[in-house]
């Protein structure tokens, strides 16, 4: 069987399966911990906690960056974060809506999707660094 990597931006929040307030046995039903998932097109689903946390990386919101003078090494990190995010968004637009992308061979499509995931992880690390600037 072939392997695939999906690239999609979702919204999610912790939720117990079946809408119960706690995990465990409820009558004849076993409710598990998991996440309510909402896709960009509005589709809603539920995912078990372990599967969700293995498949998704939490996207940190961009930090509020004051327009003040910063040491050059910090400003370079901020500039790099914005530059990388701009490139990542362009890549995702290409992946999600380009006829050219659909004509690429599946291996190249997979590499581009992997690249997007790595870029998101990199942006998240840069955001964490920026949030901890003193």
Task: Give the role of each language-model region.
Residues 1-77, 95, 126-127:
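Motif-centric detector for short Cys/His coordination patterns
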Residues 61-134:
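Extended, charge-rich alpha-helical interface modules
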């Amino acid at each position: 069987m072939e392997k695939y990597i999906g690239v999609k931006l979702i919204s999610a929040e912790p939720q117990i399966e079946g809408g119960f307030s706690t995990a465990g046995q409820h009558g004849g039903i076993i409710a598990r911990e998991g996440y309510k998932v909402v896709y960009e097109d509005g589709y809603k689903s539920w995912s078990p906690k372990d599967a969700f946390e293995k498949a998704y990386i939490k996207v940190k919101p961009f930090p509020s960056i004051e327009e003040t003078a910063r040491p050059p090494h910090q400003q370079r990190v901020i500039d790099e974060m914005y530059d990388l995010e701009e490139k990542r968004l362009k890549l995702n637009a290409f992946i999600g809506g380009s006829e050219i992308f659909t004509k690429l061979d599946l291996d190249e499509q997979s590499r581009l999707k992997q690249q997007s995931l790595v870029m998101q992880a990199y942006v998240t690390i840069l955001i964490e660094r920026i949030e901890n600037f003193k």
